């Protein structure tokens, strides 16, 4: 999986490329992150990438040409590597809310380019001419698109076969089956008078599977009822699931 990231702060991405699961995935060439600074595509001595907004108002607006020239550089790099360019994604508060399903969709693209906005906004003409999709991580505003881009890349990289130590880890994450994850426990067996549930200590696999499913249903019902409704609409709930939910 290849990511191309347009950012004024490429140094930020060392947190993703050098550490943890995502860092190992990059080391093993399961994923690659290519960083592109629009200032490198500016011809003026000051490397100007922003200007005042027409019509007035606070803040500066990222200019069209440096961004378009950067995108042209990305596409030229793809052509030289013999790969087809994937979608261009702008990180923006008005974008579609990122989800596990979108992470799975992105993985299927093979490559994706992120545009990390800064300042007040990105010139709309760049958006109209170049952007295929806009994504957000929530109804709040950050200083730029770098943190959302890293969060999304982390979610996608986890899905790459071989990226996780345990092949089942990703499939058992929250949201993969439409529900929240079940509780997890490790040693010691008793801590401050709090014990690990007996069913997890008995070694009966079928009972453990049932307990985990019920706990997943219970947590989702209490914390994210909207996910229960969505799972029901998609046919992800069994008759036994529905019977258990009625008992809550």
From Swiss-Prot:
Its EC number is 2.1.1.228. Its main location: cytoplasm. Keywords: Cytoplasm, Methyltransferase, S-adenosyl-L-methionine, Transferase, tRNA processing. GO terms for cellular component: cytosol. It is found in: Cytoplasm. GO terms for biological process: tRNA N1-guanine methylation. It catalyses: guanosine(37) in tRNA + S-adenosyl-L-methionine = N(1)-methylguanosine(37) in tRNA + S-adenosyl-L-homocysteine + H(+). GO terms for molecular function: tRNA (guanine(37)-N1)-methyltransferase activity. S-adenosyl-L-methionine binds at residues 117, 137-142. Specifically methylates guanosine-37 in various tRNAs. Belongs to the RNA methyltransferase TrmD family. Homodimer. This is tRNA (guanine-N(1)-)-methyltransferase. It comes from Polynucleobacter necessarius subsp. necessarius (strain STIR1).
């Amino acid at each position: 999986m290849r990511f191309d990231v347009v950012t004024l702060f490429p140094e930020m991405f060392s947190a993703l490329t050098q550490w943890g699961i995502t860092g190992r995935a990059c080391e093993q060439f399961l994923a690659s992150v290519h960083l592109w600074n629009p200032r490198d595509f500016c011809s003026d001595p000051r490397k100007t990438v922003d200007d005042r907004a027409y019509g007035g108002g606070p803040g500066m607006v990222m200019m069209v040409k440096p961004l378009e020239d950067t995108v042209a550089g990305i596409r030229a790099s793809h052509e030289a590597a013999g790969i087809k360019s994937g979608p261009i994604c702008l990180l923006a508060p008005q974008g579609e809310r990122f989800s596990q399903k979108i992470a799975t969709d992105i993985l299927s693209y093979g490559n994706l380019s992120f545009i990390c906005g800064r300042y007040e906004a990105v010139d709309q003409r760049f958006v109209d001419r170049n952007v295929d999709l806009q994504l957000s991580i929530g109804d709040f505003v950050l200083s730029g698109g770098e943190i959302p881009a890293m969060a999304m890349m982390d979610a996608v990289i986890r899905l790459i076969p071989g990226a996780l130590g345990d092949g089942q880890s990703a499939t058992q994450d929250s949201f993969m089956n439409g529900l929240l994850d079940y509780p997890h426990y490790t040693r010691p067996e008793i801590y401050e008078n709090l014990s690990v549930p007996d069913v997890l200590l008995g070694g009966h696999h079928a009972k453990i599977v049932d307990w985990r499913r019920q706990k997943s249903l219970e947590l989702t019902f209490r914390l994210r009822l909207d996910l229960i409704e969505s799972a029901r609409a998609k046919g992800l709930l069994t008759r036994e699931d529905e019977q258990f939910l009625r008992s809550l």
